[in-house]
């Protein structure tokens, strides 16, 4: 009765089973995986949000497939901060970047076609690809967060079914950032191979090393390119369900992509009308919130580095952006066993394979939790790592 594409293995893993048991016992661990700003004490002023929402007619509905013109005009103005000079007509609104991925897979791929994606990356991407009957092929990211892509390796992963390359910059969870030289080389490769470039930039507002924040849309090239962002990360408003895709490249391909995207979007009409009407006010009022988030990320990153013992067998990997930190363990470590031991010690982190890291040495934690909780969790983490890694 059901499609093969939805026949996912839903068996709970050891980590989720142990976590559920602890929660039932009333002893939940310190959560170092939390990525909701509001849950981490970084929410918005409710009076400000109410003033934005209260200033609009909530019952009004004027559907426009690519999004309301005023919202797209506001985005075009705001993206100037990140170096992009776009017309409002080059921007398409959706309910989320996840939805935008699905639209772009539909736009670019027939069933069975392939898309190149970075590893490590989002756990969600394989599900989105399967729902679109698209095959993902992984290429490795540099460990150096400002390091150059190996385009020979990337190209070797492709075949005649490849239609696009996905890059997340800053990458989640490693914090790798696409530099201008790499973008130019990748643009040339995509143009030569007739591939599209999909740039996921949901963390672009949060650089932590290297040059200031800049979108790939600031450097249009010869390849058809899509740059994705959304209110979930850029403004800490995941519940508002609004994201945007900037479309750039040679005019014929760009305009054809927008015309087809308009039909795809018209079939869904998913972007929230109240969120679209509120968007201009959100964009002009969110800078203080971004500053608070950036300060939290920096503070917790410093805490993590400072609390690592000098002789520890594990390392904190360098990062150039985003909300996560990655720990590298000795090569032979069973990171799932380490995560289970940490749960028993009262702290929750994520094993690397969840993000398509190679098995055996990687852990991921969020840098968003409140500083006191984060410091306590890292202290427990360091003690558990010392005990587990020393046998």
Task: Walk through the language-model features, giving the residues of each.
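N-terminal small-domain helix-loop-helix segment of the aminotransferase-like
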Residues: 5-96, 103, 153, 270, ...
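Conserved core of the PLP fold type I
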Residues: 59-188, 204-219, 226, 374, ...
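PLP-dependent enzyme catalytic core of the Aspartate aminotransferase-like
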Residues: 85, 155, 333, 343-350, ...
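Hydrophobic residues in well-ordered beta-strands that form the structural core
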Residues: 117, 138, 197-199, 349-351
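Helix C-cap/helix->beta junction micro-motif
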Residues: 132, 192-193, 345, 388
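Conserved core segment of the aminotransferase class I/II
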Residues: 218-298
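Conserved glycine-rich beta-strand-loop-beta hairpin in the small C-terminal domain of fold type I
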Residues: 276, 280, 296-305, 315-329, ...
């Amino acid at each position: 009765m059901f499609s093969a594409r939805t026949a996912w293995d839903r068996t709970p893993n050891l980590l989720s089973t142990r976590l559920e048991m602890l929660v039932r016992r009333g002893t939940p661990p310190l959560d170092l995986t939390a990525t909701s700003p509001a849950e981490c004490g970084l929410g918005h002023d409710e009076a400000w949000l109410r003033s934005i929402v209260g200033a609009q007619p909530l019952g009004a509905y004027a559907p426009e497939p690519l999004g309301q013109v005023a919202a797209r005009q506001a985005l075009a103005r705001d993206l100037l901060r990140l170096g992009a000079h776009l017309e409002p007509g080059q921007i398409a609104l959706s309910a989320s970047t996840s939805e935008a991925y699905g639209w772009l897979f539909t736009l670019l791929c027939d069933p069975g076609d392939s898309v190149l994606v970075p590893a490590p990356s989002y756990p969600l991407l394989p599900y989105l690809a399967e729902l679109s009957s698209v095959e993902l092929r992984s290429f490795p990211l540099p460990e150096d967060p400002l390091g150059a892509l190996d385009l020979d390796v990337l190209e070797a992963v492709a075949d005649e079914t490849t239609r696009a390359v996905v890059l997340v910059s800053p990458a989640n969870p490693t914090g790798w950032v696409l530099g201008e030289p790499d973008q130019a080389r990748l643009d040339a490769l995509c143009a030569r191979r007739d591939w599209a470039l999909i740039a996921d930039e949901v963390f672009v507002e949060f650089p932590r090393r290297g040059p200031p924040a800049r979108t790939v849309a600031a450097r249009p090239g010869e390849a058809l390119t899509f740059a994705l962002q959304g209110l979930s990360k850029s403004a800490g408003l995941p519940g508002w369900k609004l994201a945007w895709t900037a479309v750039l490249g040679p005019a014929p391909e760009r305009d054809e992509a927008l015309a087809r995207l308009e039909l795809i979007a018209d079939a869904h009409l998913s972007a929230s009308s109240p969120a679209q009407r509120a968007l201009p006010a959100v964009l002009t009022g969110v800078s203080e919130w971004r500053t608070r988030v950036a300060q939290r990320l920096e503070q917790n990153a410093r805490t993590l580095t400072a609390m690592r013992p000098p002789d520890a067998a594990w390392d904190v990997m360098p990062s150039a952006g985003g909300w996560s930190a990655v720990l590298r363990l000795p090569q032979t470590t069973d990171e799932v066993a380490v995560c289970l031991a940490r749960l028993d010690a009262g702290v929750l982190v994520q094993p690397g394979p969840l993000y398509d890291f190679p098995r055996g040495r990687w852990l991921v934690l969020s840098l968003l939790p409140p500083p006191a909780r984060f410091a306590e969790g890292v202290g427990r983490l360091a003690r558990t790592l010392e005990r587990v890694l020393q046998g």
